[in-house]
Structure formats: structure tokens, C-alpha cells
Amino acid sequence: GPRWHNNKLWFSDFYQHSVMTLDLSGKIEKIVEIPNQPSGLGWLPNGDLLIVSMLDRKIMKYSNNELSLHSDLSKLTPFRCNDMVVDKDGDAYVGNFGSLHHARDVKPTCLIHVDPQGNAKVAAKKLDFPNGTVITPDGKKMIIGETYAGRLTSFDIGLDKRLSNRKVWAKMMPTWYYIGVRFALATIYKLLNLQVKEGSITPFPVPDGICLDEGNGVWVASPTTSEVIRFEEGGVITDRLATPDRAYACMLGGHDGKTLFVITGKSSIPEEAQSEKNGKIYTTLVKFARAGYP
């Protein structure tokens, strides 16, 4: 989950188990080590850093160079936790994989809400791998990527932080494919105990990390098609930029908020990612500046 904060890009390196920063001169700095793999990042109003710890399903808090537990999510989901968005009040929404073996055993799963004090509860159910998430500047709408469903889904956010009025915001995967072919292929892979390679089940774009801009567009990193795509509500595509490797996440930042940072790698399969160490961060200038959260 890359984030632009204090004039630096903050990002999680899963397999070096570290939260890192990158400044505009190209300098990389290690901030803190998270033994059980860091993922989504966000900040409380007082400036404390929240970090999703994937494997043990916790949110850790980094404050004054010390790491402590903010919230334990392990009783709410059996699956690895992943991306997170934190709003201006310090309320966090955290997604999870919805499967133990990627696309082989997909199950609808939940989105978890964590209040600023660390109290956690289920905010929404029956999501297909809730992943990258954004909140509009007024704090009233959430847009979340459902990776396995190939769509962006929106919710209204109430004053009590409850989610309602669920809608499909943009569809990337045809309904016929989502309902039939994808699950048939996943079943075959599971029965034959085959390793699912990225892109082998879904030839369409899917949302991994996402970010919001001032033109009410959402930039989507799509690992299956190795690109970043800008969508507007209804599924209209305004921009499409190919990446040399698989695109896993994106964030707008820079001095004017118009630099699009794109996190890429050749694979997210742990053994391959750890041995090859080929992750890269690309940048490009875009028309609209960053908006909302994160």
C-alpha cells in the first residue's frame, strides 16, 4: 500500500518485512520492520503510523520509534489481511484475501472497520478479495477494489462510519466470465492440485492497489494485464498505461500531487519474489492531482 506522506512515498516491502520511504531524489530509507509482512499503511490524526501485519492479521501502531498492537483482527477473518485506508478521523477499513491459496479456494469475505481506539468489527460482507480502497475528500463515499470479481464497488459512509448503499462503481470483468469460467478454472486447478500462476485464470484487468484523483477518477493497478488504468464512474476508461512488469499498486504524490507512482514486480508468488528481488517503482506525470484518502 504505497502512500504519499510528508513529501515522501511510503510503501511496504512484503518480503523484506519492512516499511520503507522513497524521496524524490531516489533515496530509500527503512522505517520499521514488521516480521509478519507489512501491507496497508495509514496515519492516526496524532501522526502515529498504522501498519497492517498480514500473516498474523493485526494492525500495528508505530509511534516514537516503538511498535505496539493497535488492533487484533484474527477473530474476524481467517485470511491474510491486506490493504487498508485510514480516514481523517483515524477510522480504518481493512481488507483480506478471502482465500488461503490465491484463486484456488476463493470465498466471499468481509471488510473490517477499526475505530481510532482499535475496536474492530465487520463493516461489509460478501466481498471478493477486498483490496485497494479510497475514501472521497468529504469522507462520505468509499470505493473499494474487489480483486477476484474484477470490479470497483462503492459504499456510502455514514456519520457513524457504517457502510450502506452498495453499488458497482466500475466493472472490469464481464459478468459471464466472473460467474462461470473463472470459478470453473479455479475448481480444475484445485482438483488437480496445480499451482495458479498470476494471469492464468483472469485475462481481464483486476484491481489491486488504487488511488483517487481530483477529477473523480480512480487509478487502478492491474497485475493480470500489467498496466495502470484510470476509471471514471460507470466503467469509462480515460487513460491506460502499460508497465514493464505486473502492476500491483499505485499512488499519486509529488510536489503538486500529479506524479503517479506505480509499484511493479514480475511475480507476487512468495518464492519467486524473494529469490528474484525484481520489484521496481515507476513514475509518470498525470493530469489530475491526488484527492481524498489515502
Residue ranges and their predicted role:
Residues 1-8, 34-53, 58, 75-92, ...:
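Beta-rich, blade/repeat-based domains predominating
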Residues 11-12, 51-52, 92-96, 143-145, ...:
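Residue position within the beta-strands of beta-propeller blades
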Residues 14-15, 54-55, 98-109, 147-150, ...:
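Short, solvent-exposed loop/turn segments at conserved positions within beta-propeller repeat blades
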Residues 18-20, 58-60, 109-112, 151-153, ...:
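A short loop-to-beta-strand structural motif that recurs across blades of beta-propeller domains
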Residues 23-24, 29, 45, 61-66, ...:
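Flexible "stalk/tail and boundary" regions
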Residues 29-33, 68-72, 121-125, 163-173, ...:
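Beta-propeller fold detector
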Residues 155-162, 286-291:
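Short loop/turn segments immediately following beta-strands, especially the blade-tip
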Residues 251-294:
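Blade-level signature of beta-propeller repeat domains, shared across WD40, Kelch, NHL, RCC1
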